Amino acid sequence: MSHRKYEAPRHGHLGFLPRKRAASVRGRVKSFPKDDKSKPVALTSFLGYKAGMTTIVRDLDRPGSKFHKREIVEAVTVVDTPPVVVVGVVGYVETPRGLRSLTTVWAEHLSDEVKRRFYKNWYKSKKKAFTKYSAKYAQNGAEIERELARIKKYATVVRVLVHTQVRKTPLVQKKAHLAEIQLNGGSISEKVDWAREHFEKTVSVDSVFEQNEMIDAIAVTKGHGFEGVTHRWGTKKLPRKTHRGLRKVACIGAWHPAHVMWSVARAGQRGYHHRTSINHKIYRIGKGDDEGNAATNFDRTKKTINPMGGFVHYGMVNNDFVMVKGSIPGCKKRVVTLRKSLYTNTSRKAVEEVTLKWIDTASKFGKGRFQTPAEKHAFMGTLKKDL
């Protein structure tokens, strides 16, 4: 019930202003984990597509908790992660004003998937992107090797250019997502050699992350358009008899200063914001060619991660996937950037070994009661539509 109070704390967080639409649909990695040269060269993040959510059952291994050694039910998110393709390498040098790009070296051959990213209208274009650049490889590649040597000599940070294989997903989109991912581990020379060796080759998600690892999810949240101040900021509704509306802010400021302060709650855009959600535990990294990638030691049913009828508003996941605990930003089909954690998490939740007992694969459209088509056929018998 709407009512009035004489004092109240402010509504809404001012730390995420401005609440406007994100400039790009892809999550940007603004900070990478600290480099450790003693470790082998590896990527620090990965790109995937949010497929949907499901439910798992596991035994909690947390001494001291009331639920220790008891079954718990948790919600998990499935991210479709087909292998990414390495198509370039970028070298950065340290300057007094931060990192500055030294040079960029591209691979000889680029697929049409990533070339579409450089065109606004692919069908009306002449499709000549990178034709002059690829000719450098035909001339013994001397200039390419010279640029790689410059990176080895001057660069302090090495990042690779990778793009997704969107054709392997159920998405209608044909344009791949292109991103820079930092290489950590080894020396600068080893990083450049690793990037050169992986030109035009794929990198799978299991070479970047491992089970029980804590990772971050970076994405653009689900958009809700123009919203009123009550829903957007959570302000109190005014009393019932208020003139000209209840879902408003009664006083938006004093006479002077003669303008509305930036901190006053106002109506506007809600959702489609760039957000980073940290500390999601990986419960499973599944292989796309494994027909039993949703089976466990307690549930030996041969089934895939796809629920009956596929994930709602996404479809079938036929590639490698990452199952993380909880929900992550973004809607179905949205590209999600998965990044290694920026610090070593030593909490009990982080170091706990997770063993799944059961993964729900019932239909997510309605009240699904069958886990597999075979189970449905055994219970229902031959249906009229199957004749």
Curated annotation (Swiss-Prot):
GO terms for biological process: translation. Keywords: Cytoplasm, Ribonucleoprotein, Ribosomal protein. GO terms for molecular function: RNA binding; structural constituent of ribosome. Its main location: cytoplasm. It comes from the Eukaryota. It holds the Pfam family Ribosomal_L3. It is found in: Cytoplasm. GO terms for cellular component: cytosolic large ribosomal subunit; fungal biofilm matrix. Belongs to the universal ribosomal protein uL3 family. This is Large ribosomal subunit protein uL3. The lineage of its organism: Eukaryota, Fungi, Dikarya, Ascomycota, Saccharomycotina.
